Structure formats: structure tokens, C-alpha cells
């Protein structure tokens, strides 16, 4: 499996802001937006392109555009924070959705939403989720995509844990990984260590809010 760890000073600085427990929701979202755009940029490096003539104010120049823009598929909830940076880089991309919640006792994914094209064959797919922990949610999502014919799947995660990376490697599923960091372990609650906490809560606040 192809794994790209994006080693860049700006990537590292935004990831540091996201890790910092002092970063409030607004600061975390801003750093996530910047980092998301950088990871999408890197993930797009090998996308197929086509060339055409374009007229400048002076002469004709060779233009370039994506041959087939990828479909962006966030894993809800935390993956929603990566849609805007993805679309800022690839504005003509389509967006699909996979909704998965985590069972806090078993740490297994619980599906609740699936909004995807029926046929994903010959279609690049960018599967976005800020965190790859156990790999359960990501593997479930990849299987859903593969069932629809997807063979060109790139998982884009801000922070990955080594156990989740190993699970992805051993799955045999058609996927490559682009990430800003691979952290060494998970704690007993299946949180990435050192990680950055609960990405969904840090983006949007706690799931259950008493009014």
C-alpha cells in the first residue's frame, strides 16, 4: 500500500496548532482548513490531466485541467471539516457522504448514512477523515466504495495511528494513504496517542449539548 507522510514546515505548524489543547473550536477549525487544503494538494499530485489551448492577453498558451476530478467523500461527522478545503482546491469535484458513529463500548463503527453514486468505477475517490485510529471506520467506508466499483481510492487523514495504518495495509483493499503524521499508539479508549483529541468535538463542540 502506498503511504505518503507529508513532510513540510507549514503542515507541521498547522498540525501543532490542532494538537494544542489550548486551541479553541475556531482556532482548531482554521488550522484544520489550512492543513486540509495542503493534504488535498499533495493527494492530487498524480491525478490525470488533459491539456488544451488557452488564450492569454498576449498569445496562446498550453492550459492544464484535471481529466476527471475526484469525488470527495467525508466520513461524517469530523470529515465535514475537510469538505471546504477540498473544494477550495478542486471546485468542480462532486461530494458524497458516509455517516459513521463510533460505539463507545466496542469502538466499532455504526453506519447511519450513505449518499454515494451507484457506479464509482473509473472514478478517483478522495475519502477524507481527520483521524485514522483503529481503522474500523475507514475500512468500512472503503468497502462501501469498493462495492460500487471504486478502485482508485485515496484516504486523506490529518493524523494516523500505527495500528490503524497496519489494519489498512493488511486489509488488501484498494487504497492509498496521505497523512500529516503517524502517531505510535492508541490508548485504552482507542484514542490516538498523542493525537489531537476528538476531532469532531474540537471542530464543532460536543455531540450532546444541554440547553
From Swiss-Prot:
Catalytic activity: UMP + diphosphate = 5-phospho-alpha-D-ribose 1-diphosphate + uracil
Co-factor binding comment: Binds 1 Mg(2+) ion per subunit. The magnesium is bound as Mg-PRPP.
Biological processes annotated in GO: UMP salvage; uracil salvage
A Pfam family this chain is assigned to: UPRTase
Enzyme class, spelled out: transferase
Regulation of its function: Allosterically activated by GTP.
Pathway(s) where this gene product acts: Pyrimidine metabolism; UMP biosynthesis via salvage pathway; UMP from uracil: step 1/1
The protein, known as: Uracil phosphoribosyltransferase
Organism (species): Corynebacterium efficiens (strain DSM 44549 / YS-314 / AJ 12310 / JCM 11189 / NBRC 100395)
